[in-house]
Amino acid sequence: MIGRVTGILVEKQAPEILLDVQGVGYELLLPMTSFYNLPEVGQETTLFTHFVVREDAHLLFGFSHKQDRSLFRELIKTNGVGPKLALAILSAMSVNEFVYAIEQEELSKLVKIPGVGKKTAERLLVELKGKFKGLQQTDFFIKSSHLPGIKCSKLDQSLQLDEAVSALIALGYKPIEAEKMVKKVLKADLTSEQLIREALKAAL
C-alpha cells in the first residue's frame, strides 16, 4: 500500500493533481480542504495517501494531514459511503467541522453536502458518533483571509469561474447548481481555489 508520497507538483486542476515522484507521474484526487494547502506548480509537496482498487480503476487519494486521511477511512467504512462521497464530504467540511456536526447531530448541515441525503446523514450520525475523540484537537480549517489573492483580468476571471465550476461538478454538484454557487461568491480578486472555498462555505 502507498501511504505517503513526496514529489514535484506538475499539474493541479481541482480536485485532481499530477505529482512527479522521481520521474513517475502519480495522479491523485484530493478533497478541497487539502487542495487549498498545495504549493504552486513546480514546488515540492508531501501527501498522505489512500489507495482504492476497483474493477474499473485504481484510484489514489491524497491528504495534507493524517487526520484527514483517518476521517476519509472512517467515512468509507460507513454503509453507503464510497470514496467519491467521502471526498465530497471532506471538501465541504474540515475535520473539526465534520466531527462537530456528528457530535452535535447537525443533520441539517450534513444533508447540504452533495450526495448526502437524509438516510445517509442519519447513518453517518449513528455509525460515527463518538469515534473521533482524537481528531478534533487541531483545526485544519484554513480561513479564506489566509489565502493569497491575485488580481484577475476579465479573461482570467472567466477562467477562474470555469475551473471552480468544474471542480464543484467533480465533487458531485449539478452543473447549474455549481455555476450558481460560484457566481454567488464571484469577486475579481479571488483565485479558483478561493472561489471553490467560498462557494462550499456559503452552501453550508
Curated annotation (Swiss-Prot):
Residues 156-204 are annotated as: Domain III. GO terms for cellular component: cytoplasm; Holliday junction helicase complex; Holliday junction resolvase complex. GO terms for molecular function: ATP binding; four-way junction DNA binding; four-way junction helicase activity. Residues 65-143 are annotated as: Domain II. Gene3D superfamilies: 5' to 3' exonuclease, C-terminal subdomain, DNA helicase RuvA subunit, C-terminal domain, Nucleic acid-binding proteins. InterPro entries: DNA_helicase_Holl-junc_RuvA_I (IPR013849), Hlx-hairpin-Hlx_DNA-bd_motif (IPR003583), NA-bd_OB-fold (IPR012340), RuvA (IPR000085), RuvA_2-like (IPR010994), RuvA_C (IPR011114), RuvA_C_sf (IPR036267). Residues 144-155 are annotated as: Flexible linker. It comes from the Bacteria. Residues 1-64 are annotated as: Domain I. It is found in: Cytoplasm. Homotetramer. Forms an RuvA(8)-RuvB(12)-Holliday junction (HJ) complex. HJ DNA is sandwiched between 2 RuvA tetramers; dsDNA enters through RuvA and exits via RuvB. An RuvB hexamer assembles on each DNA strand where it exits the tetramer. Each RuvB hexamer is contacted by two RuvA subunits (via domain III) on 2 adjacent RuvB subunits; this complex drives branch migration. In the full resolvosome a probable DNA-RuvA(4)-RuvB(12)-RuvC(2) complex forms which resolves the HJ. Belongs to the RuvA family. The RuvA-RuvB-RuvC complex processes Holliday junction (HJ) DNA during genetic recombination and DNA repair, while the RuvA-RuvB complex plays an important role in the rescue of blocked DNA replication forks via replication fork reversal (RFR). RuvA specifically binds to HJ cruciform DNA, conferring on it an open structure. The RuvB hexamer acts as an ATP-dependent pump, pulling dsDNA into and through the RuvAB complex. HJ branch migration allows RuvC to scan DNA until it finds its consensus sequence, where it cleaves and resolves the cruciform DNA. Has three domains with a flexible linker between the domains II and III and assumes an 'L' shape. Domain III is highly mobile and contacts RuvB. NCBIfam families: ruvA. This is Holliday junction branch migration complex subunit RuvA. It comes from Histophilus somni (strain 2336) (Haemophilus somnus). The gene is ruvA.
